[in-house]
Amino acid sequence: MKKEFASPRKLLSVLLIFFLVSSLALAGCSSKNSSAETKTKDGKTKYTMWTFVQVHADYWKDAAETWNKNHPKQQIELKINVLPFDQMNQKLQVALNSGNGGPDIADVEIGQFAKYTKSNNPPFKDMTKEVEPFVPNLVKSRTDNYTVDGKIYGLDYHVGTTLVYYNMDIMNKAGIDPATIKTWDDYINAGKVVKEKTGKYMTSAETSAGFVFTSMVAQQKSDLVKDGKSNLSAPENVKALQTIQSMLKTGIAKTAEGGHQDNEEYYAAFNKGEYASVVMPAWYMSRMVGFMPKLKGKIQITGLPIFKEGDLRSAGLGGTATVVTNQAHDTALAKKFVVESKAGKEGSIKTWTILGFDPIRSDVWTSDELAAPNKFTDYFGTDIFKQMAAFKDEVGGLSVTNNSYPIINDEFLTNGLPKIMKKQANVEDTLKALDAAADKRIAAGK
C-alpha cells in the first residue's frame, strides 16, 4: 500500500535540497567570476576546494604551498572546505546539476563517481592532456577508474594495493611462515592449524562490505559488471564467495565486528589479537597505526594468495579522485595544479609521507623517501614498499566507475552478502537472483 503522507525524514530531505538549490542559485547569481573575485590583491589565482577528509585538506594545503614555491609566476590561493561525507556529496551534486555554487576543485569518492558520468557531458574537466606525460609511471588501474570514453577526469590519492596483514605473534605460535602460503587453499589449511594450536580465528568474513570479495574477484580478472549488466554470478565470483563462506563453515573465520573490517569495533578486536590476519588495502596501515598500537612491530604484509596460476596477487580497492569541475575558472591552471600535485614525483611521495597511502606512481615505491623513518616505518618496518614492488604489476581492478556498478553493488551488499554469510545461503543461486534484480533496476534507470 502506498503511503499517503511523506515521512518527517523525507520532508526534511526535500526542504534541505530546496534550501541548497536556493542558496546555490543565489550564490551563482552574485558570483560570475569577475577578476576581483578570482584574484587576490597580490595577483594570486583564487580557487575553492571541497573535500570530506581532514587529512586530505592537510595534503592540499601543503600542495598549494609547494606549487607556489615551484611556480612563482603562477601563484594560487586555495581555500579548502571540509564537509561531512554525505553532506558534501549531496551539496556537490546539487551544485553541479544546477550549474552554480560549486567549487573549482573537489574530491569525489570512487563509489560516487559514476553518478556524475552518466551523461555525455560530465561536470568535470578532461585532464587527459595534463596526465599523459606521467602515464608511464602511474598504476594503470588507478587511471582507468576515472577514465570515461578515453578521457581522464580525475586522479586518485592511492593505489589501494590489497594486502594480507599477518599478526606474527599468532602465526609464530602456530608455527606458520606466511611466505609458505601461496594459494587460498594454503591459507585455509593454515587457518585450521592456527585455530587448532592457538584458538584464534585466521580471519573474518564481512557481512556489510565487500573488500575481501572484490579483491578476490579482481585478482581473477573478473568483474561485477559486463557489457553494462550484472555479472555477479560469473564463475570466478561464485568461487570467491564460496571460498569466504567455507572459512565460516570450517570455523577458521567469524563474521566481522560491525559487519566489516573498517570500523572501531573491529579495530579493537584485531588489536586484542582475536585474528591472525586480515585482508585489506594498503591504506589500512593508517588504521593500524592509529587504532592498533599493541601490534606495532608484529605485523607482516604479503600479497594475496591466488586461486590458480595466472591470477594477480593484489587488487586496487577504494579510492577518491580529485577533479576540476566545470564551474572552475582558469581551468588550465587548475588542472596543472591538481595533476602535478597528484602525479608529479614530489606530490606522489607526499601521499605517503603526509597521508600514509601507497602512491599512484609505482616508480617512487623504491625511493629513499618511502623508506625514511616515520610513524609507518616505525610500525611496519622500512621495507614496506620493497615488498609491494614485487607485485606492482599485478594489481587488478573493477569497473567501479561504470554507470551500472552502484546498482549492482547495492543489490549485492543489501540483498546478497548478508544472506550468504549470515544464513549460509547457496552462493550461485543467490548471485543469479541478484543479477536478475540488478538488471531490472539498470533497465529502469534506478
Which residues does each PLM region occupy?
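Short, well-ordered beta-strand elements
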Residues: 42-54, 76-81, 104-105, 153, ...
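C-terminal lobe and pocket-closing loops
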Residues: 114-116, 284-295, 308-411, 444
